[in-house]
Curated annotation (Swiss-Prot):
The lineage of its organism: Bacteria, Pseudomonadati, Pseudomonadota, Gammaproteobacteria, Enterobacterales. SUPFAM superfamilies: OsmC-like (SSF82784). This is Protein YhfA. The gene is yhfA. Pfam families: OsmC (PF02566).
Amino acid sequence: MQARVKWVEGLTFLGESASGHQILMDGNSGDKAPSPMEMVLMAAGGCSAIDVVSILQKGRQDVVDCEVKLTSERREEAPRLFTHINLHFIVTGRDLKDAAVARAVDLSAEKYCSVALMLEKAVNITHSYEVVAA
C-alpha cells in the first residue's frame, strides 16, 4: 500500500491514496478538515463497520443501516496518544437477530478489522452495539 501527503497551506495537508482518492487533514484542531487523530478514529470505525455489514449480509440478515459512534480518551501530555476507544454500533434492520449482530461485532474486533487490531496493540479498545428494528 502506498499514499502521499502534500502540504496545502498553514497546517492543512492533502492526502492521496494509491487508488486516487483524496482527503484533507488539518493540524489546527480540525479548523478546515479532520485532524490526523480524528482520521485514525474514523478509520477504525469505518473498517469495523464494513466488516459488520459484510458479515451480516453474508449471514442473510436484512440490514438497512449501520452507524458507529466512536468515543475516545487521549493522554493529556504529548504525545497525545489514544488510551481508550469505544466503538458503539447502531445496527438497523428487519428481523435482525441480536446474536448475529453480536457475532459480527466480535468477528470484526477479534479477526477482521486491521485498523482496530493494529491499534489494539497500544490502545484499550472496547465494542458495544444496539439493534434497532426498521
